């Protein structure tokens, strides 16, 4: 029975261009959407720009534009990326559209009627010059623990201390430099801690989608959610109520009946999924409310692991208690790395999607490579340049494309491009084997196990190439009286090539369209693998795909950033300050030997709930136990990035009681004093062969 699907990807924040992580997610979702359409299902695939919030308002002001114009300019640059990588959204909208304003306010009113909205007074820093309340990211000052300057309003990146913004010494607004003052403000909260919400979410997160029968969430996601639900013996932890309001001036959607109050961007952003679909339906003359109320509709979201909390807790609770359908599935993926490392422009490991296209690299090389690394689990995808070249050249060109190129020419020259339906038993056995794989490959696409689907397709291609090598059409073409046999062998190859193209079409849509033209067939669906072409005429073969020139990879990776005048060798000779700050006063060797620096291996790492700066690290320092250290490196490293790495720790620093637990040391990292001009945070890592516990002397 045909399905009707509503599919989205996470909304990109409208303050910059797409990065490679966006493109990876769009490719993952686009493959799934194309597969569903090849199965005969109706799919509405929509996206939008996340257009609200203080960062956009401030960036627009600096650019001399209104927020609306700033967002519109960003949106105007989306098309080259989407078209270039064959991402087939049905609609692209903005969370600042009228549909989102209406839907967000309607959702709020429904939650308020349901008794899940309350208000309370909170204290915040206020910039008297800008006349606005300051989020933590716009407040800096001296750390109350170690005295380090220019630290953010919630934690110190030097000593790792966590504190309230009110504890900062000499605080200042990063917007104006003014000293902020404390002001109270009434804020609106969504009562996520309500027993009603908790009971619903426990059922929803553990449940299965009514139509597919599959779990709504992946096992890894469900395990993480269980951690968020957990409370200690004193009842601490668990889900907290959610502050959904911000004070004017703010670029966003006004809260009904609350002058000067706006929805926090994370309330209206996911509602943007619905708004984009409504915008599309209105343009198509379709009934949005009827579609969303239809029990046959399936709602599916593709997101990155960093926004799991919002999409698996806030979002379904908001929908359920405002009377709307909840998602059938939230599919979570990992991040993308380069050669096992987090991408970094300064280290020459950043991939610009637009540069990829501009230097002439085939978009479907990347689609294939990413698909060959993706599965249904929450795992990172690693882009390795050498592996990229080998997979594309060996699999796509060497195994798949070559099947057609080895057979089509003989059919055109000797048989006027006509295939024969009279195939011997050997050919029928080969083709029946390819046809029998259809359901398995379809199941793998459905489960987002793209890597397995492509491995199975390439294993089939290997069997076809073995058939070609065994029957040697190039030799048959030279032998008298072998025309019928030559036509059979070449027809078998083209039939097999067509079946493989069906299986690869969700990943390679542009190439598949070329193949459909070459084969003179209508757009192919998965069901078409159940039949053969038979006595059918094809067009003359034209080369379908070039091999990757490894030199293109050198051009792809952005070179390290050019040194600024302040840090260039010439400037250094003129007395530049190294690292942006003067050297500390001279100490004696006796002073230095008081510090016990040891090599440590990071055996585990996790985010610290309630902090945007800290990671909780578990360190092996060679003591026979693991130490816990809170380190302010979250801005540069995800937990998965650092697990297994060696680094340097101050081992004899007195344990420090912090809000989140006891920190037993300090991990050393390097950064420039002027982080705006010179962003980056770098762990100190020893050369290979090091073991935990070695002393740094």
From Swiss-Prot:
Please list the residues that bind ATP.
345
The record's section on InterPro entries has:
aa-tRNA-synth_I_CS, Anticodon_Met, Met-tRNA-synth_bsu_C, Met-tRNA_ligase_1, Met-tRNA_synth, Methionyl/Leucyl_tRNA_Synth, MetRS_core, MetRS_Zn
Q: Name one GO molecular function term.
A: methionine-tRNA ligase activity
Question: Which region is the signal sequence?
Answer: none
Q: Please indicate if the UniProt record lists Ligase as a keyword.
A: yes
Alphabetically ordered keywords of this record? Aminoacyl-tRNA synthetase, ATP-binding, Cytoplasm, Ligase, Metal-binding, Nucleotide-binding, Protein biosynthesis, RNA-binding, tRNA-binding, Zinc
Q: Where is this motif: 'KMSKS' region?
A: 342-346
Enzyme class, UniProt record, top EC level: ligase
Supply the EC number(s): 6.1.1.10
Highest taxon above the source species: Bacteria
Task: State a GO cellular component annotated for this protein.
Answer: cytosol
tRNA-binding domain sequence ranges = 591-697
Record: residues binding Zn(2+) = 143, 146, 156, 159
Location in the cell reads: Cytoplasm
Q: Which GO terms describe its biological process?
A: methionyl-tRNA aminoacylation
Recorded hits in SUPFAM superfamilies, A to Z, give:
Anticodon-binding domain of a subclass of class I aminoacyl-tRNA synthetases, Methionyl-tRNA synthetase (MetRS), Zn-domain, Nucleic acid-binding proteins, Nucleotidylyl transferase
| Record Pfam families | tRNA-synt_1g (PF09334), tRNA_bind (PF01588)
Question: Which prosthetic group or cofactor does it need?
Answer: Zn(2+)
Family membership noted in the UniProt record: Belongs to the class-I aminoacyl-tRNA synthetase family. MetG type 1 subfamily.
Could you describe the subunit structure of this protein? Homodimer.
Question: What does the record give as the function of this protein?
Answer: Is required not only for elongation of protein synthesis but also for the initiation of all mRNA translation through initiator tRNA(fMet) aminoacylation.
Protein known as: Methionine--tRNA ligase
- Give the source species: Methylibium petroleiphilum (strain ATCC BAA-1232 / LMG 22953 / PM1)
């Amino acid at each position: 029975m045909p399905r009707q699907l509503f599919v989205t990807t996470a909304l990109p924040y409208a303050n910059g261009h797409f990065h490679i992580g966006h493109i990876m997610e769009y490719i993952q979702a686009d493959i799934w959407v194309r597969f569903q359409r090849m199965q005969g299902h109706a799919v509405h695939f929509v996206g939008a720009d996340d257009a609200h919030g203080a960062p956009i308002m401030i960036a627009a002001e600096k650019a001399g534009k209104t927020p609306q114009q700033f967002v519109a300019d960003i949106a105007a640059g989306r098309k080259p990326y989407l078209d270039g990588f064959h991402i087939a959204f049905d609609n692209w909208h903005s969370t600042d559209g009228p549909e989102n304003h209406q839907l967000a306010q309607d959702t709020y009113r429904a939650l308020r009627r349901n008794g899940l909205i309350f208000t309370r007074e909170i204290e915040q820093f206020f910039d008297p010059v800008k006349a606005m309340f300051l989020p933590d990211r716009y407040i800096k000052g001296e750390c109350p623990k170690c005295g380090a300057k220019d630290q953010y309003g919630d934690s110190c990146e030097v000593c790792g201390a966590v504190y309230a913004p009110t504890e900062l010494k000499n605080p200042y607004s990063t917007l104006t430099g003014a000293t902020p003052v404390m002001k109270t403000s009434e804020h609106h909260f969504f009562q996520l801690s309500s027993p009603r919400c908790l009971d619903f979410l426990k059922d929803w997160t553990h449940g299965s989608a009514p139509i597919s029968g599959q779990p709504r969430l992946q096992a890894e996601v469900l395990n993480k959610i269980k951690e968020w639900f957990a409370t200690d013996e004193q009842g601490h932890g668990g889900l907290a109520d959610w502050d959904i309001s911000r004070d004017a001036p703010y670029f966003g959607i006004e809260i009904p009946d609350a002058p000067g109050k706006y929805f926090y961007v994370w309330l209206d952003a996911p509602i943007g999924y619905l708004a984009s679909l409504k915008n599309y339906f209105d343009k198509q003359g379709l009934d949005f409310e009827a579609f969303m109320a239809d029990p046959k509709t399936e709602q599916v979201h593709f997101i990155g692991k960093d926004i799991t909390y919002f999409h698996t807790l806030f979002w379904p609770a908001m929908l359920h208690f405002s009377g709307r359908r909840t998602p059938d599935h939230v599919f979570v993926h990992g991040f993308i790395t380069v050669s096992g490392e987090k991408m970094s422009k300064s280290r020459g490991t950043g991939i610009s999607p637009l540069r990829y296209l501009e230097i002439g690299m085939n978009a479907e090389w990347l689609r294939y490579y990413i698909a060959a690394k993706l599965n249904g689990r929450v795992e990172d995808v690693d882009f390795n340049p050498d592996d990229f070249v080998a997979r594309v050249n060996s699999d796509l060109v060497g195994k798949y494309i070559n099947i057609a190129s080895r057979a089509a020419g003989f059919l055109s020259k000797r048989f006027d491009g006509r295939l024969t339906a009279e195939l011997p038993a050997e050919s029928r056995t080969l083709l029946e084997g390819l046809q029998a794989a259809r359901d398995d490959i379809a199941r793998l696409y459905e489960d987002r196990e793209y890597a397995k689907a492509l491995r199975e397709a390439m294993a089939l291609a290997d069997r076809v190439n073995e058939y070609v090598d065994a029957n040697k059409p190039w030799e048959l073409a030279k032998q008298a009286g072998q025309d019928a046999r030559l036509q059979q062998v070449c027809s078998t190859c083209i039939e097999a090539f067509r079946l493989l193209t069906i299986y690869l079409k969700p990943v390679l849509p542009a190439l598949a369209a070329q193949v459909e033209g070459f084969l003179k067939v209508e757009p192919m669906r998965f069901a078409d693998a159940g039949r053969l072409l038979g006595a059918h005429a094809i067009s003359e073969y034209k080369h379908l795909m070039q091999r990757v020139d490894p030199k293109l990879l050198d051009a792809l990776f952005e070179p390290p950033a050019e040194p600024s005048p302040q840090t260039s060798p010439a400037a250094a000779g003129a007395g530049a300050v190294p690292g942006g700050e003067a050297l500390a006063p001279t100490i004696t060797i006796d002073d230095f030997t008081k510090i016990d620096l040891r090599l440590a291996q990071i055996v585990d790492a996790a985010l610290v709930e309630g902090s945007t700066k800290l990671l909780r690290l578990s360190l092996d320092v060679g003591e026979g136990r693991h130490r816990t250290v809170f380190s302010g490196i979250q801005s540069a490293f995800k937990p998965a990035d650092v697990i297994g790495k060696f680094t340097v720790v101050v081992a004899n620093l007195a344990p420090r009681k912090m809000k989140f637990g006891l920190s037993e040391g300090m991990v050393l990292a390097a950064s420039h004093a002027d982080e705006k001009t010179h962003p980056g945070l770098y762990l100190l890592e020893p050369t290979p062969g090091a073991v935990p516990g070695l002393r740094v002397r």
